[in-house]
Amino acid sequence: ILYHWRVHENSTAASSGSKTYTVQSGKKALEAHLSRMNIKGKVYEAEFAPNFFKIEYDLFKTPLVSIVIANKDHKEDLKRCLDSLKKSSYKNYEIIIVENNSSDNEIFEYYSEITKDGNIRVVNWRETGFNYSSINNLGVRESKGEYIILLNNDTEVINDNWIEELLSIAQFDNVGIVGAKLYYPDDTIQHAGVVIGMLGI
């Protein structure tokens, strides 16, 4: 297939600024689609480029969300993670920390401190070695929430509405799992999702 891209000074192919009405037209088209599908949400123009849009879906309900965090030692990492969670605008959540073979007394003292908060529990994975799947499965079994978030202990939440963002997609019947964009400390992207359905995966 030979494809030619025609660039004209009065065309959006050269610059979106030449036809600014296309932004509003795109926004209205998405709003009309939501209305036809009987889905409640707001359409916003993306900040990074013109004629790109973000849909913020309304939550159907506010279910309990269980946040499972596997942890071994590393008090400072865990503390940073938990401190960032406190900034979350979504409040109906519980935290299950799966302790796996820590040897530093400092972390156990920290556990005693944080479990005074009613929505934080520590459960013990008592097997030897390291099995990340088994550790997380224990946390899931101990969870009471309708939705589960698997979170690394060295993660720091940077957007206070992060739980709402995940829920707004996960709540649809045709969605089984939702991933988040992760950044390194220097703001480069560490992870931006996994594509499934290719090569039989």
What are these regions (language model features)?
Residues 16-41:
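Catalytic core of nucleotide-sugar-dependent glycosyltransferases
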Residues 63-68, 94:
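Cell-envelope/extracellular polymer assembly enzymes that use nucleotide-activated donors
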Residues 83-92:
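Short, acidic, metal-binding catalytic loop of nucleotide-sugar glycosyltransferases
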Residues 92-101, 123-125:
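Short beta-strand/loop segment that forms part of the nucleotide-sugar
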Residues 99-110:
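A conserved acidic beta->alpha catalytic loop
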Residues 125-143:
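Glycine-rich, basic loop-to-helix element that forms the pyrophosphate-binding segment
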Residues 148:
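Short aromatic/hydrophobic "clamp" motif used to bind/position activated sugar donors
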Residues 156-200:
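Conserved donor NDP-sugar-binding/catalytic core segment of glycosyltransferases
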